[in-house]
Amino acid sequence: MYEGVVQDLIDELGRLPGVGPKGAQRIAFHLLQADPADVRRLADVLLEVKAKVKFCSICFNVSQDDQCRICRDPRRDPSVLCVVEEYKDVVAIERTREFRGRYHVLGGAISPIDGVGPEQLRIRELMVRLADGTITEVILATDPNLEGEATATYLTRMLKPLELRVTRLASGLPVGGDLEYADEVTLGRAFAGRRSADD
């Protein structure tokens, strides 16, 4: 244990995802030894991100504007909608350059053990988007784990009465994995080989 604000800094850094106690300590000591101007820039950027970044009013991707660049892009196919769990999944799919439609970010996955049901996700907003008839295909690009599969199954049942083409990403993604960690080739192949969600 360190004194006062040093320990406070280590504790706060340790709350970040993927940063353990030793990593938090290394980052804290790096910041203590860094040039004050560099630390100020980091602090300013953190505050600026919290102040300026919000969620797109259409798809719920991160954006500095009311609508994200993907929703504003007239070259994107408005008839195909890719449903993902988190905004970081949008980045992973965009890296493949295989998908030219639009997105809908649910904000998580159904996980009863964590107290997350359909009501906590942006499923209501998804149904509103589908109501105008512009979208003809929905790609369910949830993580290939238990929660992702539960979410995809739930959505498939919800979407069936709408008579849309509902597809899932093809295999090739490891079960139990997260989309954001898939390499571009694997994710690209999974996109190209997607299948009907009813199969």
Curated annotation (Swiss-Prot):
UniProt superkingdom: Bacteria
Classification via HAMAP family: RecR
Family classification: Belongs to the RecR family.
Domain Toprim span(s) in chain numbering: 79-174
Entry protein name: Recombination protein RecR
Keyword Zinc appears in the UniProt entry: yes
CDD domains on file: TOPRIM_recR (cd01025)
UniProtKB keywords: DNA damage, DNA recombination, DNA repair, Metal-binding, Zinc, Zinc-finger
Zinc fingers typed C4-type, residue spans: 56-71
GO BP annotations listed: DNA recombination; DNA repair
Gene Ontology MF terms in the entry: DNA binding; zinc ion binding
